[in-house]
Amino acid sequence: MLAMASGAERRLAVMPLPRQVNWRGRSGRFYALMPERLDSFQLVGEDLFLLARGTLPVWVGSAFDVINDAQSRARFRLALEAADRAFAVDVEADEVTRMTVVWDLEGAEPVNGLSAA
């Protein structure tokens, strides 16, 4: 006998994630973030991610940060418990730019009414 998926599970499987969403950093800069499934996203290398609970960023960083920085690792563990969404952040590879983006996104908020191209 085949198990039937609940209505909510079927809706989740059918509904694709939005293409990109806009967030405004504390500096006023806009970022087009790519939504990821929280239950299946993977920290890989120096790829940057933002974990949020609603409209509040709870952690911004990469696998490199989790591995090499005890404070970031502790914040990441707490963020996994609290977060209800994850976003991939497209950022340049140089360290200064990456650190600046992390700082900026830690105080970011989603922007309604703008469409990311």
What is the role of each PLM region?
Residues 110-112:
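Conserved "boundary/linchpin" sites in short secondary-structure elements
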Residues 87-92:
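Canonical phosphoinositide-binding patch of PH/PH-like domains
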